Amino acid sequence: MLNPIENRHIGRFRIRRRLINKEPRVVQAIMRNIIVLAAEQDFATDTITYTAIGNVFESVNVNYEVPMYRLAFMEHKGDVAFSFFKEKGVY
């Protein structure tokens, strides 16, 4: 497995505060495979924007803008499946 820190697999994504409060188990499953570097509260959208390292993100060159990802998840019979999709032109 690639080392996400050495290979700079970095991304940003948002999670609604409502999801954190109502479905913490889903958020725990998402956070299990990443290392959060920063979290920023956005009161206007009631979301938290995370900057994180993990193999779920593409490699980013030094001095490049960290890309934004859209998080999609599905819960079925207690199992949580999720994916990160890189947003085009959003940084």
Please place each PLM-identified region on the residue numbering.
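Detector for the mature cores of small, proteolytically processed
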Residues: 1-30, 37-91
